């Protein structure tokens, strides 16, 4: 939906939703991908699945492509995580990966409500493993230190977009 489109990724509890909220507060067009684009499906085929698992948390590729093709907005930020990002990552002008140290991650996980992903112990263990392995986030993204206050995190993203 923008002339310039940016993806903001990262493991759970790195601040993707908070960054999206701050971008919207500042008046930017920012899409909560996990709320607006996500569903449970096969990451390769897109076929819907009946089970709710982390591995099947994917985005509607056609919706992502349509939003990127629409140039009504000068800049659009897509915030969230998906297991099928490889199907559309090349459409973005830049990809940012939010990262935090393990102590910050553990603190945020403890604070997470049980009803949200990461609120259960088994989910926390998965998130900590994914934090260590980086296996389901873009490898070539621009790392953003998301341990800082949210205003500084968003400022760091803006600084990187100006350099592109």
Please give the residue ranges for each predicted region:
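The Walker A (P-loop) glycine that initiates the GxxxxGKT/S ATP-binding motif of P-loop NTPases
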Residues: 10
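Conserved glycine(s) of the Walker
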Residues: 15
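Conserved Walker
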Residues: 18
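Conserved substrate/cofactor phosphate-moiety recognition/catalytic segment
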Residues: 21-64
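Loop/turn-to-beta-strand initiation segments
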Residues: 72-77
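Small-molecule kinase domains that catalyze NTP-dependent phosphoryl transfer to phosphate-bearing small molecules
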Residues: 85, 114-159, 163-164
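Conserved phosphate-donor/acceptor-positioning beta-strand/loop module used by diverse small-molecule
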Residues: 91-111
């Amino acid at each position: 939906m923008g002339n310039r489109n940016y993806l903001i990724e990262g493991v759970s509890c790195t601040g993707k939703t908070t960054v999206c909220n701050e971008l919207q507060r500042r008046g930017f067009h920012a899409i909560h991908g996990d709320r607006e684009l996500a569903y449970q499906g096969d990451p390769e085929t897109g076929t819907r699945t009946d089970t709710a698992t982390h591995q099947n948390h994917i985005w509607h590729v056609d919706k992502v492509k349509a939003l990127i093709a629409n140039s009504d907005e000068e800049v659009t930020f897509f915030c969230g995580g998906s297991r099928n990002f490889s199907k559309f990552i090349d459409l973005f002008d830049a990809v940012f990966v939010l990262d935090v140290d393990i102590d910050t991650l553990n603190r945020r996980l403890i604070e997470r409500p049980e009803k949200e992903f990461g609120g259960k112990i088994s989910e926390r263990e998965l998130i900590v493993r994914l934090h260590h392995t980086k296996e389901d986030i873009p490898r070539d993204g621009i790392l953003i230190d998301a341990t800082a206050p949210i205003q500084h995190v968003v400022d760091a993203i803006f600084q990187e977009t100006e350099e592109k």
